[in-house]
Amino acid sequence: MTDLVVEDGSIVGANVEDLESTYRIDAKKTIIATGGFTRNADLVAKYAPDYTSAFPFTGAGGTGDGHVMAEKLGAPIIGSGMMGLSGINPSLGYYGPIGGAVWSAQMTVNAEGERFMDKKFYGDTLALLVEQTNSCGYGIYDASNEIVDRLEAGVEAGVVAKYDNLDDLASGQGIDADALKKQAESADIKSAPFYCIQRKPLFIGSIPGIKVDEHCRVVNGAGEEIGNLYAAGEVMYANVFDGTYPASGSGVGTSCYTGAISARDALAALA
């Protein structure tokens, strides 16, 4: 889709293109369900400037097309923050035998050697990481960890660092050694060898979105309905939650029920 077709202030369809041609689709009702903008660095800088150090771990289609089109029509983009967690890199993220090792850190510290993450509420992980020096947390493990075999595989892959002692770990990773050792003692991390994974901030979704009413109808800056236009799913998340990722399932759940709300309202209007 390249843009929406407007007649007399209402949406009557969309202009689209494929590999061979450009054409118009007429529609009595249009629902924007284009997802987020995690794959569009310019929109991240525009709508969530505090999060430019994070990388996307999302589908390739999250380029924010719906946000751009709606804003051109006068619809406000509301909300702040991004949805995200921590991962190793854009390929491994936090999945699989190696990527998933980020979840098993015995503690995570910043470059100052301070623990800053709450294991009980991981929804704040992204927001906390981007605030740290180098936008990075350091997951610390020792030989007693139950996933040592996976850590060793990570060492072989070049994404997990292994050290004989905590002083070498601190030096190798640029962490304050005294603070690190103090935190390690409190966490009972004492069995050599020691391992470290750099936990980087990653996106799993975006929050800022198109402003809608309770029927998921898109509205303009004055709160007036833009005729025949709806928004559902990630493209309008900020109407439901804002700032940080509330909990697992928040995005999928919101997408399901806003899709149903918008579709039911559109069908009722056409009946």
Predicted regions and their residues:
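A glycine-rich dinucleotide-binding beta-alpha-beta segment and adjacent secondary-structure elements
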Residues: 3, 179-243
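Glycine-rich loop(s) and the adjacent beta-strand/alpha-helix scaffold that form part
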Residues: 18, 24-89, 252, 261
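An anion/pyrophosphate-binding glycine-rich loop and adjacent beta-alpha core
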Residues: 63, 67-175
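Short, small/polar residue-rich loop motifs at catalytic or cofactor-binding pockets
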Residues: 101-103, 204-206, 248
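Short, well-ordered coil/turn residues at beta-beta hairpins
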Residues: 27, 33-34, 111, 232-235
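Internal hydrophobic alpha-helix adjacent to the cofactor/substrate pocket in enzyme cavities
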Residues: 66-76, 173-176, 181-184, 253-271
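A conserved short coil-to-beta-strand element within the FAD-binding core of flavoproteins
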Residues: 1-11
